[in-house]
Amino acid sequence: MKRVLTALAATLPFAANAADALTGAVERQPTNWQAIIMFLIFVLLTLYITYWASKRVRSRNDYYTAGGNITGFQNGLAIAGDFMSAASFLGISALVYTSGYDGLIYSLGFLVGWPIILFLIAERLRNLGRYTFADVASYRLKQGPIRTLSACGSLVVVALYLIAQMVGAGKLIQLLFGLNYHIAVVLVGVLMVMYVLFGGMLATTWVQIIKAVLLLFGASFMAFMVMKHVGFSFNNLFTQAMAVHPKGEAIMSPGGLVKDPISALSLGLGLMFGTAGLPHILMRFFTVSDAREARKSVFYATGFMGYFYILTFIIGFGAIMLVGANPAFKDAAGTLIGGNNMAAVHLADAVGGNLFLGFISAVAFATILAVVAGLTLAGASAVSHDLYANVWRKGATERQELKVSKITVLILGVVAILLGILFENQNIAFMVGLAFSIAASCNFPIILLSMYWSKLTTRGAMIGGWLGLLTAVILMVLGPTIWVQILGHEKAIFPYEYPALFSIAVAFIGIWFFSATDNSAEGKLEREKFRAQFIRSQTGLGIDQGRAH
């Protein structure tokens, strides 16, 4: 039973230890000129791509979805690039470095969310939607209320995720490049705005693809060099790691990540359903031409991510063997220079020298840029498409909608920079956990039930969705992370760190109860529209850019 609970707790990749890669204390490193030069090459390449993309962005369709011309393979790479964060690369390899086997469960467990997207969501989402998941949620329900709720859910998730990434960017760049924190945050903010403002989804997609290729290449090379060192024998790798690790054989045993069964379930559910409710991930399914390509996207993305997280396991054990046993990477007190989260970076130095160290440092920074670009575009589309064009000013022209989207990108960029600076010394590890909980408690139930439950009504979706969102936020505030660690109270009112188990239940029960008891004429009409929606969700008939599949 403990192994099952350990695996469940492991499924939130950014929580606890992995989040520390972006939020823990950092020690500024000497200026790394190789890393800076390689990063500048990456920036120049991506700025050229943005310029190239800007010449091809002529319509709303181009801006939001790259014209629907991205292939399943390209989109799979871009999704992987959007999802493989610096926290998972540095944090999970650091967790393997310190805890051994637990890190494998931690790194692979989060993939549980992707089969849900593949089998339940990808095809119907592509057939029913155009630009945002609110298109799907509001397909047969009242546009105004549902789009407002979906946009609020999206913006809260984007804001929390964005703050965590910006603070993480500043601290990571302090670590890797020796640059000032404020300069780093401003640099990320400016580049993020340029990619999205001028290049839209096309530039964002190619930034994510390039980042994914670089990260997979870098991690593959590190894993190859580690395995070469041990004669390509996993037995030798584990034996040598056990010989030098302070915990000895204990690193090959599970346990130690779980406080209690409720926390384990809450973490597991938060990621499993949260992944299927992240607006910047869902938006990527509208960049392909049809449902077949959407399914292929998930297939490729899951393959790339699964491969990457297996590599982090090898990298973690390689770090135990080549970094942990080498005094050159330790300070006077015997701890790893820069902290345990630098294990993968030090391993890059150990297997590839200073040049490869510079490459991995630049890739870590590129990783953050790819993630924040996707978040910014998702936030901007929620405001311009869902709120402005479909709620506040119905009948707005494409030009007006694009103008609002680009103004929103600028505002999001400024706000992200200011909040990144404001939260510099705060514990922001909880923010990504909260983002996943809200995505799982508000966005996911509405998307799933709008596509699969014929009796869903606007009243049920609105009340249940808001209940889920508010429950997630309130329980998080009353929990040990915010109530005790941040606000300084003696004891938490809500005893568990993550609220997903409770807030998801509240959302689904609320949606079911208030839909089932809705006897209004509007509710009856919405139920009758389900058959037409079901036919389109299966066939794609009538969809823009739709092709046979």
From Swiss-Prot:
What is the protein's membrane topology class? Answer: Multi-pass membrane protein
| Major site of localization recorded for this protein | membrane
GO MF, one term, reads:
symporter activity
**What's an example GO BP annotation here?**
sodium ion transport
Please give the coiled-coil regions recorded for this protein: none
Where can this protein be found? Answer: Cell inner membrane
Q: Where are the transmembrane segments?
A: 33-53, 76-96, 103-123, 149-169, 183-203, 206-226, 262-282, 303-323, 355-375, 404-424, 428-448, 463-483, 493-513
Top-rank taxon, per record: Bacteria
Sorted alphabetically, which PROSITE patterns does this protein's record hold?
NA_SOLUT_SYMP_1, NA_SOLUT_SYMP_2, NA_SOLUT_SYMP_3
Q: Name one GO cellular component term.
A: plasma membrane
**Keyword entries, A-Z:** Cell inner membrane, Cell membrane, Ion transport, Membrane, Sodium, Sodium transport, Symport, Transmembrane, Transmembrane helix, Transport
- Family note: Belongs to the sodium:solute symporter (SSF) (TC 2.A.21) family.
Please explain the role this protein plays, according to its UniProt record: Transports acetate.
PANTHER family per the record?
CATION_ACETATE SYMPORTER ACTP (PTHR48086:SF6), SODIUM/PROLINE SYMPORTER-RELATED (PTHR48086)
Q: Under what name is this protein listed?
A: Cation/acetate symporter ActP
Record gene name: actP
